[in-house]
Design a protein with these regions (language model features):
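Short, charged, surface-exposed loops that flank catalytic or proteolytic processing sites
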Residues: 66-74, 133-138, 159-163
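Gly/Ser/Thr-rich beta-alpha loop segments that engage phosphate groups in nucleotides
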Residues: 6-10, 93, 111, 118-122, ...
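Alpha-helical structural signal
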Residues: 17, 122-126, 165
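Feature representing long, continuous alpha-helical segments
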Residues: 74-77, 104, 123-124, 137, ...
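Short, small-residue alpha-helix embedded
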Residues: 63, 115-146
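Charged C-terminal helix
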Residues: 149-181
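Short beta-alpha connecting loops at secondary-structure transitions
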Residues: 59-65, 107-113, 123, 127, ...
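Glycine-rich phosphate/dinucleotide-binding loop and adjoining beta-alpha-beta core of small-molecule
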Residues: 1-108, 177
């Protein structure tokens, strides 16, 4: 289940997100799904035995209680371990971190992807890969790499400043072909 894309900050959203934490299925929290837990990160402890993935950008990460001072990789690894979640810290060199301490920095992607909706594409890819049964860290790494590669293809074809999240979607098949053929 994916929660947060376009959710908004209206009254009741925070309580809704906290109630969804009790569901048994894998849960991906993005954007306002993460913001809804700000100040309530202890609620994640109820999900330690279930797959939970957070996909914040740096601002959402800090609002959720993350500390970037030790550097992005260390910060992501520490947060994932402390809260028992998988974390995809978006930004230059997106980081995927697992609760067991594993951490990966992604080499694909570019600054043209830093716009509203790009993270929604990533979150959708991630929840789709989890739905296919990929192990969580593999799903995180694959989604992040494919998302970044689709962004690199879009930048080459339409330019960094003109690319949109739809351009990412259009290039996912080409990115997939690069690793499957």
């Amino acid at each position: 289940m994916l929660v947060g894309c376009g959710l908004g900050r209206s009254p009741g959203c925070d309580g809704l997100v906290r109630r969804l934490l009790d569901l048994p299925r894998p849960l991906v929290l993005d954007a306002d799904g993460i913001n809804a837990l700000s100040g309530h990160m202890d609620a994640l402890s109820r999900r330690r035995d279930r797959i939970t993935v957070l996909t914040p950008h740096e601002g959402e990460f800090v609002r959720a209680g993350g500390d970037l001072s030790p550097g992005r990789e260390r910060a992501a690894a520490d947060f994932a371990r402390e809260h028992g979640v998988y974390l995809v810290l978006k930004g230059p060199g997106t980081i995927a971190a697992a609760p067991d301490g594993r951490c990966m920095r992604n080499p694909t992607g570019n600054c043209g992807m830093a716009k509203g909706g790009s993270g929604d594409v990533l979150a959708g890819m991630l929840v789709s890969l989890l739905g296919l049964g990929l192990p969580p860290m593999d799903a995180c790494c694959a989604a992040v790499w494919l998302h970044g590669r689709a962004g690199d293809l879009a930048a080459r074809q339409v330019g960094l400043w003109g690319m949109t999240p739809s351009d990412l979607l259009d290039r996912i098949p080409a990115a997939l072909r690069e690793v499957t053929e």
